[in-house]
């Protein structure tokens, strides 16, 4: 899907599609080797993983592009809640967007409400909540209870939730990875896939372990 949907339209879309009981356990490969290795194989189902892009160009978009390709191959749906209007679909191949639901939120509270609805729906293997671009003062005003609610919903519905941020905001996240270094100029001459494969992340929270990767 190359066009975003608003909150109300998202509710109508989900209402027309029966909810599913997602598969429990296991993980979902992002396709970015360094990220998957740090997580013990991929994004764990039933958990919130926070991916911090500490500097511009440090690789957050590469991880998302790789995730879209990996889930497309595995025939898994992805939902993106875009809290700061940062998603640029024209930079992605059209075939990578066919399994993506893109929700453009008008505010952080609306973004959190969208994420809460989607994580409980069961039709999406991965929920990505992108809060990069939201000012730190706004994020810091977000009650801890809202993040805790998202974490509980992920656990109850076996959803893999990826929060993309610029600094640590999800205090209750079981997993936190940090992309610290922007890409060197020489790396920009490589393909997107090559740059994604070369990414490395610091594991700031969590305990890597081998998990079963789910496919179609």
Spans of features found by a protein language model:
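Detector for small/aliphatic-rich hydrophobic stretches
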Residues: 1-80, 94-97, 216
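Solvent-exposed alpha-helical segments within well-ordered globular domains of core cellular machineries
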Residues: 33, 37, 112-117, 148, ...
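Conserved RecA-like P-loop NTPase ATPase core
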Residues: 35, 51, 100, 127, ...
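Hydrophobic/aromatic beta-strand patches that form the interior of the parallel beta-sheet core
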Residues: 49, 79-81, 101-103, 162, ...
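Conserved inter-motif catalytic segment of the P-loop NTP-binding fold
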Residues: 66, 74-137
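Charged helix-capping and loop-helix junction motifs
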Residues: 141-149
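Phosphate-binding/switch region of NTP-binding enzymes
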Residues: 151, 155-216
């Amino acid at each position: 899907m190359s066009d975003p949907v608003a909150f109300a339209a998202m509710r109508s879309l989900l209402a027309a599609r029966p909810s599913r009981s997602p598969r429990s356990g296991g993980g979902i490969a992002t396709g970015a080797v360094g990220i998957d290795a740090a997580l013990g194989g991929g994004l764990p189902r039933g958990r919130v993983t926070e991916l911090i892009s500490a500097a511009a160009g440090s690789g957050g978009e590469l991880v998302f592009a790789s995730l879209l390709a990996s889930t497309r191959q595995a025939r898994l749906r992805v939902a993106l809640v875009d809290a700061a209007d940062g998603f640029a679909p024209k930079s992605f191949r059209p075939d990578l967007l066919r399994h993506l639901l893109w929700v453009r939120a008008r505010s952080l509270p609306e973004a959190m409400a969208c994420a809460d609805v989607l994580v409980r729906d069961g039709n999406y293997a991965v929920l990505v909540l992108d809060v990069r671009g939201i000012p730190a003062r706004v994020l810091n005003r977000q009650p801890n209870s809202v993040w805790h609610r998202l974490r509980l919903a992920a656990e109850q519905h076996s959803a893999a939730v990826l929060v993309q941020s610029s600094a640590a905001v999800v205090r209750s996240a079981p997993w936190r990875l940090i992309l610290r270094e922007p890409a060197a100029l020489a790396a920009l001459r490589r393909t997107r896939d090559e740059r994604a494969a070369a990414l490395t992340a610091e594991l700031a929270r969590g305990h890597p372990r081998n998990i079963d990767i789910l496919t179609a």
